[in-house]
Amino acid sequence: MENPVIIYVISDAIGETAQHIIRAVTAQFSLNKPADIRRHAFIRDESALLETLEEAKAADGIVVQTLVQAKLAEYATNFCVQNNIPNVDLLHTLTAAVEAKTGLKSKQDPGNMRRLDSNYFDRIAAIEFAVKYDDCKDPRGLLDADIVLVGVSRTSKTPLSSFLANQNWKVANVPLVPEIPIPAELFQIPAERIIGLTTTPEKLAQIRKVRLKSIGLDEASSYSSEKRILEELEYGYDTFKKLGCQVIHVEDKAIEETAALITEIITSYH
C-alpha cells in the first residue's frame, strides 16, 4: 500500500507502552512508508475518547488502546466493533488473567504507573548524571558511575548512556583519542564496571562520513580515512586490554540490543 498505516494510540496515561510495542511490531514488516503513529494521551472521559475514536474512523486507522479504566476500554472496544475498526486492547486480557489468578481486582488507576516514587527520582538523577558526565566532561564522575562506556568517536557512547540512564543506571563515558591521555580515574575503578565499545573499520568509516556530511564538512577528512580509523581502533583495543574490561561490537546492533548486553554483563558481576 502507498499510504502509511495509521495507528491511533489511545491511553489514559502517557501511551509509551503501546508506542514501544507498535514500533517492535511494525519493524517486522517491509512497509513502503513508516507507520503513522498518532498518540492520544490522558484520555480520561468518554467525550474525549469518542472524539479520538471518530478521528481514527475517519482516517481508516488501527486503534491500539492502553486504557486502564475498564469502562473506557469497553466503550472503545464496542465503538471499534460497531464501526469495523481494527482494535487491540493491550491491557485488559492480561489484567483479567492476573485477576483470575490472584483473586484480586485491578485498581484501575491510570496514574498508578507514573507515581512520583523513589524510582522516578532515581531515574531523573541518572539522566542528569549522564548529561553531566557525557564525553568525560569531568573525570571525577567516573568514580561514582555504575557503568563507564569507553570507545572511539561514533561508537554510540552518548545514546547508550542516555538509554541506560532511563533504566536508572548512572553512566559516564570516555572518548578514546590517541593524542589525548586516558584519565587516571579510569584505572581507579573496577574493570567490571567498564565496557569497551568498538566496531568494524568499514562501519565506522560509513558512520563518520555521514556525520561529516551532516555538518557540512568534507567526507574525505582524515576523521573518516582508513588510516586514521585503523589507528584509533587499534588504540582502542590496546586501551581495553590495559583496563581489562569487557568489549562489545556495536556494528549492526540497535541501541536497545547493545544496552541489554551491557546490563547483562554488569549484573553478572553482582
From Swiss-Prot:
InterPro entries in alphabetical order: Kinase-pyrophosphorylase (IPR005177), PPDK_reg (IPR026565)
Keywords, alphabetical: Kinase, Nucleotide-binding, Serine/threonine-protein kinase, Transferase
Catalytic class of the enzyme: transferase
One Pfam family matching this protein: Kinase-PPPase
E.C. numbers: 2.7.11.32, 2.7.4.27
Catalysis performed (reactions): N(tele)-phospho-L-histidyl/L-threonyl-[pyruvate, phosphate dikinase] + ADP = N(tele)-phospho-L-histidyl/O-phospho-L-threonyl-[pyruvate, phosphate dikinase] + AMP + H(+); N(tele)-phospho-L-histidyl/O-phospho-L-threonyl-[pyruvate, phosphate dikinase] + phosphate + H(+) = N(tele)-phospho-L-histidyl/L-threonyl-[pyruvate, phosphate dikinase] + diphosphate
Recorded GO MF terms: ADP binding; ATP binding; phosphotransferase activity, phosphate group as acceptor; protein serine/threonine kinase activity
Transcription regulation keyword on record: no
NCBIfam families named among the record's database cross-references: PRK05339.1
Family designation: Belongs to the pyruvate, phosphate/water dikinase regulatory protein family. PDRP subfamily.
Protein name as annotated: Putative pyruvate, phosphate dikinase regulatory protein 2
Species whose genome carries this gene: Listeria monocytogenes serotype 4b (strain F2365)
